[in-house]
């Protein structure tokens, strides 16, 4: 059963955020919720930890309420009791997987990695995101790599070629910053743009093309 609280009292603890993009909310999702609230819509209650008001599920809803109604905003919450942070984190993953903004593959890989770090049993982590244990292990192996310091990091679709590797600093930078598009797509896009004379050849762009040419030559020299 939900109760009413001041939205400003709720705590966004990013350690409990089950997605890979910590400190970052989806601006499109928040904007959609703001518009819904402005026309009188009522969003589902936010799930919080009863002990300290940390948000388990509802970061975007809380942000939208504060944006629309200010620091005096009221919000409906469901307060739950958790024995420990790992239990709270698993519930956050379960709730985020079952409704609202979908958790992408990189989000799920991040969630599994953090569950492993928190010593959450495989079966518990798998059930939270709607997978069986074997499927989860195979998915995790295809969607993670390890840094030189030993940290396991999730990979987007664009970084899947690095799965299972110990990453160099350059590879780690790519893995952390790449999005869901595979690199081959960008190659095709650039070729098409160049053929269509659609690239604005600023000094910076020309400099980057020269840099690209050098990288391509290194690759071609290696396959001759």
Can you say where each PLM-predicted feature lies in the sequence?
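Amphipathic, charge-rich alpha-helical segments that serve as recognition/docking helices
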Residues: 18-27, 63-145
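A general nucleic-acid interaction/assembly signal
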Residues: 127, 133, 137-177
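Charged/polar low-complexity intrinsically disordered segments, enriched in acidic residues
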Residues: 156-224
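Short coil/turn helix-boundary motifs
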Residues: 40, 118-119, 201
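Hydrophobic beta-strand residues in large extracellular and virion-surface proteins
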Residues: 46-48, 136, 209, 216
